[in-house]
Amino acid sequence: MKFKVKIKALEIALLENGASYTTLQKRTGLSSKTIFKVYHGKPVIPSTCVKIADALGVHASNLFERAD
């Protein structure tokens, strides 16, 4: 099962945390390719969702939804 990001929710979480694309990459340890996929609404695996949500201090369900 894969998930895609809720863009507005991600933008809000990033603003609230003073985080950027680069900051998120450093906090999660994910590759720039993976972060790019997330930012562009491409489907990602659950562990990626959890890493991003944890880095931003939110629950993964607030940032991601199932991809069709």
Residue spans for each PLM region:
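DNA-binding alpha-helical recognition surfaces that contact promoter or target DNA
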Residues: I12, K26, K37, E65
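Recognition helix of helix-turn-helix/homeodomain-like DNA-binding domains
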Residues: G29-V44
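Short, basic-rich loop-to-helix N-cap that marks the start of a DNA-contacting helix
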Residues: G41-D54
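Residues in the helix-turn-helix
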Residues: T23, T34, N62
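A short, Lys/Arg-rich alpha-helix, primarily the initiator
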Residues: M1-T23
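Short C-terminal boundary/hinge segments that cap the last helix of small helical domains
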Residues: G57-D68
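Residues within the alpha-helical elements of helix-turn-helix
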Residues: R27, A55
